[in-house]
Amino acid sequence: MRMLRWLILSAFSVAGAVQAQGNQDSAAASASSASIGAPVLRTSPGLRVHRLPDEKIPAFMEADQISGDPDSEVTLTGNAQVRRVDGIIKGDRINYRRDTGDVDVQGSARMLRDGTLITGPSARLNVDTYSGEIQEPNFWIGASGGTAQARHADIFSKSQMRLSQVTYSGCPCPKPSWYIKADTVDLDFDENEGVARNGVLYFKDVPILASPYLTFPVKKERKSGFLMPTYGTTSNSGFDISLPYYFNLAPNYDLTLVPRYLSKRGAQLGGEFRYLGSGYRGVAIGTYLPDDNETGRDRWMYRTYHRQLLGNGFYTDWDIAGASDDNYFRDISELGLNTASTTYLPRRGRVGWSSTYWQTYAQVYKYQTLQDPDAPLAPPYDKVPELWLKGARYDWGGFDAEWVSTAVRFQRPLLNGRRLGPDGDRLQTYPTVSYPIVRPGWFLVPKVGVHYTQYRTDWYNRDWNRIGLSNYKRTESRTVPIMSLDAGMIFERDASLFGKAATQTLEPRLYYLRVPYRDQSALPVYDTTLADFSFDQAFQENIYTGGWDRIANANQLTAALTTRWLDANTGFERLSLSAAQRIYFQDQEVTLPAEQPRKNVRSDFLVGATAALTDTLTTDVAAQYNPYDNKWSRGMVSARWSPQRLTTVAVAYRYQRDPLPGISYQPQGQNQVSLAVQWPIHRRWYGVGRVDYSLRSEPATAAAAEQSPRVTQAIAGLEYKGDCCWVGRVVYQRYAVSAADTNTALFFQLELTGLGALGTDPISLLNRSIPGYQSVVPPTPTGTTFERYE
């Protein structure tokens, strides 16, 4: 018989308890979220929250037969269950003392709370204190997806229990690939901690790791403790192993310490501190290796980044890094991370302010230049300090107005005691006004501005600009008006591409630029270089990039034409073809020191194409062609084919012609082919690889003499996807660390789903090196307490 009166009473009582519990949890979540500056939902002040004590929470009972005194002891027989807002108990027969909260379950006991399910042949439990014991229990932990079997379980409270003779696994397969056996396991769900004593990790029934004391999280949340060790080997440092320890200090900041041993160099300690608050965030990392066995001196590096909102539009940030010596990143790079190419370490601090129409900041920006002895570099200028101001007002009666001003003090570090250039101050201001006319199918944008620059320079009695002067003026100024007109049209028509309906566009564009000549040969050059000619640069006001220490005279017209084929149903761009050329009506008279002025009346041709020939094959082409000597100045061709998941082939060719002998303001040439692959080999085996090969030979400049044909990077690896819950990886990497030297690395990884990974994680390396790479293990969605409902 069913007790209808109890059902109705309990239904109303449980609804009230759920509301009270939910409101309290929402308030707690709001407080937590507010501490890190996230948007939050807050409880209305008009709602009253009532938290019932555990012994007052009403119960709902159901069974095929119910007997006894409803105010003292009740016996439920057949499909019996006791439901409360905080948990569910089921069994074949349940004796329930309502006055004490004691529950005795006989036969097919099931207990569910917060997504954790416990089953066993029998159980004794107090529903008020949630304490008791259960024989031969089986556990399913909803928050993590883990399962466990034990000989006996003692339950001390809602959040704490002890299991004896335990087998635990986070693998959901019928026959788990890995599991942990332990004499006892203590679980604390509030602290998100499990402690296994005399634990042994088994993989394929083979013990691979043992410890008298192991800790692990019981929920998919952060927890203090040791992380999985990483290990590998490199030619520069030998065998490399580290054992990180993670400190979950608070919800909004944490610390990771990384003891590390390198067989050729010694012991190193590293650390990373991360923090996040309302209006600020940052990270600080560092490493220290005392008395390097290879060099005999201490080796270290650090980097700290911070950004903070100060209120009323003000903010501050810094990015400061340093290393003990030039070769630190070539000798002690992180496994799987090619940091050997790191050249400039920033040392910047800034304070700024921003409003609707104005932005400004003051900063000090310096660098540490890590020199390669085989290819020394001139260190860039330090800005000590720089003041920057920008005002902008758009659609102001149809006009767009901008004003940009900077004031900088430049100082150049010495290189081996030698001075490499002048020092000085530079003041610039550049107001502009434009009137964009944008209509369906066409646009016209006239623009005018005046660029003013004032210099105060310490020349140190040297002819840095190579113009034959022995006595440069200490102060100089320059005023240059700049005028441009940008116009374009867009035509559309119905068309077809590869037999499919498409919309074709035709987009001609003209850009006229007029800049009168100003003699700038006696002005210093601090942070200005010749820009690469490209589709974007063809529509810019200056052929130089950076701080505009040179503004080229111009009387020129850029003509460009683009046509696209768009899928008629989705709008997806299937094919795009572009071409552009600049026509000069005036010779170039403004140059960088030692730069040869242009005399041609036409620029190189720019051509480009992108095509998604099918849903699995894409190609890109970009090239620059010199019509005067009928040679390619630069080019890039790439293609990627991804016919299915975990299958991709990417090939690319990059070329850039060498500059003429003695020209240092243009980049060095490049002639390189790259091939990257992820491919299924056989059943569960997958191959990954990449090779970058430089085809350079007979270099045109002495600076490129070391750039003979060679492999600049090679990656080869195998991945094996196990039958359930595990993946094995082995990856080999060889890469250039300088103009003449290379480093090799070999690392292994065993990834156990639900636990972590042993060894060095190569995923970031593979993601960066193989376009379209996909992990053989798809991401697992995070479990919740609502994974199971009964």
Curated annotation (Swiss-Prot):
Keyword annotations: Cell outer membrane, Membrane, Signal
Membrane-spanning intervals of the chain: none
Key word Membrane present: yes
Domain of life: Bacteria
Record-linked Gene3D superfamilies: Lipopolysaccharide (LPS) transport protein A like domain
Signal peptide coordinates: 1-20
Quaternary state and interactors: Component of the lipopolysaccharide transport and assembly complex. Interacts with LptE and LptA.
UniProt family annotation: Belongs to the LptD family.
Stated name of the protein: LPS-assembly protein LptD
Naturally occurring in which organism (per UniProt): Bordetella parapertussis (strain 12822 / ATCC BAA-587 / NCTC 13253)
Lineage of origin: Bacteria, Pseudomonadati, Pseudomonadota, Betaproteobacteria, Burkholderiales
Gene that encodes the chain: lptD
